[in-house]
A protein has these predicted regions:
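PP2C/PPM-type serine/threonine phosphatase catalytic domain
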Residues: 1-223
């Protein structure tokens, strides 16, 4: 989630649901009838409505791909097939930006988690974030692919060095199994920089502990 702009380029995927502007409070119940559960955020960038197109194309591709995953893959096989998907969508977004002047340098970040065959994985490209709240303590799980994170605090925090499309020459996807088992009571939160640029990690922690809702975080970001 993130603060909504007039032209909102963020998009959310929750299994088979796509959301952009609506406020949402959702509970996902895993009834073990489905092999895969997926939640992701893409934060698009580019002129005109190019960012909206990039984030939408990426998440629709991811949803279609996740629904078609074969059962019983090993961790190595799952990681390999996810990387193949990433390479394909990166080429698609980059090509669309090259052949259409109005979509020049269109791109998007991507962050999400996938529950596949009893295992939890997280993925990240860019500076959208995955956090975990456990026992009242907030931890950033993902790593920002930003100039500041790569070269130090003297660099701007809002310049990313990795994205899907966007003319990026070395696009890559972090895809990892969770190191710690997911525990009862854990809260996992995805957000674009539209949230964490407006509110500190400590304030995010306080809001999650106190209220535990997306709407409370959005209100805190606006105040």
């Amino acid at each position: 989630m993130g603060c909504v702009r007039k032209n909102n380029e963020d998009m959310i995927l929750v299994n088979d649901k796509f959301l952009r502007d609506d406020e949402i409070e959702s509970t996902i119940i895993d009834d073990n009838n489905s092999t895969t559960t997926i939640v992701a955020i893409a934060d698009g960038m580019g002129g005109h409505y190019a960012g909206e197109v990039a984030s939408s194309d990426t998440l629709h591709s991811l949803q279609y791909f996740a629904n078609d995953l074969p059962k019983g893959m090993t961790i190595a096989e799952f990681t390999e097939i996810m990387m193949k998907w990433f390479d394909n969508i990166n080429l698609t977004i980059d090509t669309k930006g090259r052949i259409n002047p109005e979509m020049s340098l269109m791109g998007t970040t991507l962050v999400g988690f996938i529950h596949y065959d009893g295992k939890f994985f997280w993925m990240n490209c860019g500076d959208s974030r995955l956090y975990r709240l456990r026992g009242g303590e907030l931890t950033q799980v993902s790593t920002d692919h930003s100039l500041r994170n790569a070269y130090g605090n003297n660099e701007p925090s809002n310049i990313i060095i990795n994205c899907i499309g966007g003319g990026c020459q070395t696009s890559y996807l972090d895809i990892c199994e969770f190191r710690d088992p997911v525990k009862e009571g854990d809260i996992y939160m995805l957000c674009s920089d539209g949230l964490n640029d407006m509110i500190s990690d400590k304030d995010i922690e306080v809001e999650l502990v106190t209220h535990g809702t997306a709407n409370a975080l959005i209100e805190a970001a606006y105040t």
